């Protein structure tokens, strides 16, 4: 018998099995194709707005995704650099093939993991708890816990024009049949979602004189806190072009053969990542849409056409592509397509990702209604950790909304009504000023170490960094600069420099003051800093904390206020039917979602402030 069985080796499954194995659990990873581990079936990229923050949080908790993209990335950029630090988001283009090879190698080299190439079509359940996984042959593999990371494979159906056929993730991969029906027989409620992917083109057929080059950052920052530098990495360029009105007219000619508009697609698609035909239908007044041409690897001619996701007929796809500047003679390697698949409404999971209906069964990734590699990987990591902790009879590991984007993600899943593929945005995180990509290790490394996924070396490295930040902050608070030095530091600034000596910490709160300039201006300050550290990441943390100090203090007060509600647990057996004073909608939503705390209950749509007041009185202040 295995401790933990993981079904599916996509981004959720990989992080789940690695997290569990690294905590000492005996694990089995079951996947239908061992050559497709961590396959990037859609865009060949990791990170982006909010997703980059999640990737660095995964790294801080001992996950693998950040290391994988550092090793296999072909272009690195920091998005939103012109905005405040809370909005900075790392993103990298990946070598799609190498990413999969890297992740398989890591899994094969990890102790405590066995691999089986097969498919899970059912669960062995006894007395309300999972006991193992059932394969198509009828064989039952016993396990103390099972984590389902099914991606888009559950009854997957691919659409290209009016043609549709079974498919699991790509056109060449079969779907998983039987598992949805097995879960429904156990009491789970399933829904249907849709996602899509654009065509791939031959990069040799692009006219580069008509497209705009988009290069990587000259001094790229690694995703992983354990990668020293990416300076040696040769980067490739992406390219930008636009659709035009002719493109839109050609696409409209295919609407009569569109599975999206004909009603053949029943699943709900992602609102914030619409297909190109949906964009021109919903925004008819917009004359053009940006198209990004992204290489799929350093050693392939295949190119991903970002912004052109479509399920229109192949002939329309090619005609429309060839109307775009730079693509007049383009060759299409693979058509775009839409895929429908089953998911399970996530009000049926706890914030540990264990299901409420079947004990020791965990859901992670698109089975919970999310989209995106990063969101899936984060769930896999948390499911793997919590499955391991439960087997060890240890306290569950739950991140709240003030601690991590991962906490926001999972809290949204268990409290909100998911009716379309969920993706993370910075706007989803009310504590985003504190949840930056640059401080993920400071926020989460200790928790990962306590959970067993972060080794002692990584933990001590982070603790040393935290100590250096405290010492440097103390130095900035105690050391002062004289007016003549301040005048030099503020040369050209709109504000008048102070006439009295001022603490460096107060000076650094001013937006025009640069830390590096102060090192040049004051030998004493430079000497004091060098005694503490030469790590630019430490400098960055001190400066950000000083410049955002007022905002961070307000955020802390809000966190403390919310924590008071989170401290009120709601028993799992609590019946809302007998509570007088609840609104009908509130009673219905609370019964459906079964929140674990009053704080969680307060975030369920349809539960009013007066409903929360009633609960506080009933459960006890």
From Swiss-Prot:
One of its GO terms (biological process) is tRNA methylation. It comes from the Bacteria. InterPro entries: FAD/NAD-bd_sf (IPR036188), GIDA_C_N (IPR049312), MnmG (IPR004416), MnmG-rel (IPR002218), MnmG-rel_CS (IPR020595), MnmG_C (IPR026904), MnmG_C_subdom (IPR047001), MnmG_C_subdom_sf (IPR044920). NAD(+) binds at residues 269-283. Its cofactor is FAD. Its main location: cytoplasm. This is tRNA uridine 5-carboxymethylaminomethyl modification enzyme MnmG. It comes from Chlorobium phaeobacteroides (strain DSM 266 / SMG 266 / 2430). The lineage of its organism: Bacteria, Pseudomonadati, Chlorobiota, Chlorobiia, Chlorobiales.
């Amino acid at each position: 018998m295995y401790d933990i069985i993981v079904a599916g080796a996509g981004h959720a499954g990989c992080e789940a099995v690695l997290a569990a194995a690294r905590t000492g659990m005996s694990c089995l990873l079951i996947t239908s194709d061992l050559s497709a581990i961590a396959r990037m079936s859609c865009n060949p990229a990791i990170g982006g707005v909010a997703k980059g923050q999640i990737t660095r949080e995964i790294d801080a908790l001992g996950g693998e995704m950040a290391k994988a993209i550092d090793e296999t990335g072909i272009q690195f950029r920091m998005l939103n650099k012109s905005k405040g630090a809370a909005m900075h988001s790392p993103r990298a283009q990946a070598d799609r093939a190498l990413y999969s090879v890297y992740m398989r190698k890591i899994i094969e080299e990890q102790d405590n993991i066995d691999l089986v190439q097969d498919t899970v079509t059912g669960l062995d359940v006894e007395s309300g708890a999972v006991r193992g996984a059932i394969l198509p042959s009828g064989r039952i593999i016993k396990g103390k816990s099972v984590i389902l990371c099914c991606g888009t494979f559950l009854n997957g159906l691919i659409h290209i024009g009016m043609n549709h056929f079974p498919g699991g993730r790509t056109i060449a991969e079969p779907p998983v049949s039987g598992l949805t029906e097995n879960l429904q027989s156990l009491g789970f409620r399933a829904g249907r979602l849709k996602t899509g992917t654009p065509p791939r083109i031959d990069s040799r057929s692009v006219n580069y004189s008509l497209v705009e080059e988009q290069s990587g950052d000259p001094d790229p920052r690694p995703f992983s806190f354990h990668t020293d530098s990416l300076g040696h990495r040769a980067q490739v360029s992406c390219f930008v072009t636009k659709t035009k009105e002719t493109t839109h007219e050609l696409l409209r000619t295919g609407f009569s053969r569109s599975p999206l508009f004909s009603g053949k697609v029943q699943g709900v698609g992602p609102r914030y990542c619409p297909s190109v035909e949906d964009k021109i239908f919903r925004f008819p007044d917009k004359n053009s849409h940006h198209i990004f041409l992204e290489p799929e690897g350093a050693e392939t001619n295949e190119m991903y056409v970002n912004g052109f996701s479509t399920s229109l007929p192949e002939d329309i796809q090619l005609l429309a592509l060839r109307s775009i500047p730079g693509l007049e003679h383009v060759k299409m390697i693979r058509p775009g397509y839409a895929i429908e698949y089953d998911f399970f409404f996530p009000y049926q999971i706890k914030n540990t990702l264990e299901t409420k209906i079947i004990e020791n069964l965990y859901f992670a990734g698109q089975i919970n209604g999310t989209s995106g590699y990063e969101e899936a990987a984060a769930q896999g990591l948390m499911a793997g950790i919590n499955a391991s902790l439960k087997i060890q009879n240890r306290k569950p590991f739950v991140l709240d909304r003030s601690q991590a984007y991962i906490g926001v993600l999972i809290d949204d899943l268990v409290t909100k009504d998911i009716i379309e593929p969920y993706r993370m945005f910075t706007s989803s995180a009310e504590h985003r000023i504190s949840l930056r990509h640059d401080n993920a290790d400071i926020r989460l490394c200790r928790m990962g170490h306590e959970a067993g996924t972060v080794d002692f070396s990584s933990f001590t490295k982070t603790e040393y960094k935290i100590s250096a930040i405290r010492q440097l902050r103390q130095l900035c608070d105690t050391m002062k600069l004289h007016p003549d030095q301040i005048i030099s530091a503020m040369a050209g600034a709109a504000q008048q420099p102070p006439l009295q000596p001022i603490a460096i910490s107060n000076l650094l709160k001013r937006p025009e003051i640069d830390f590096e300039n102060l090192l040049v201006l004051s030998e004493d300050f430079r000497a004091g800093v060098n005694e503490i550290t030469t790590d630019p990441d430490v400098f960055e943390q001190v400066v950000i904390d000083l410049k955002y100090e007022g905002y961070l203090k307000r955020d802390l007060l809000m966190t403390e206020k919310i924590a008071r509600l989170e401290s009120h647990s709601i028993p799992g057996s609590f019946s809302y039917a007998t509570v007088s004073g609840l609104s009908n909608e509130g009673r219905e939503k609370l019964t459906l979602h079964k929140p674990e705390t009053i704080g969680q209950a307060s975030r369920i749509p349809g539960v009013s402030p007066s409903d929360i007041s009633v609960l506080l009185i009933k459960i006890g202040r």
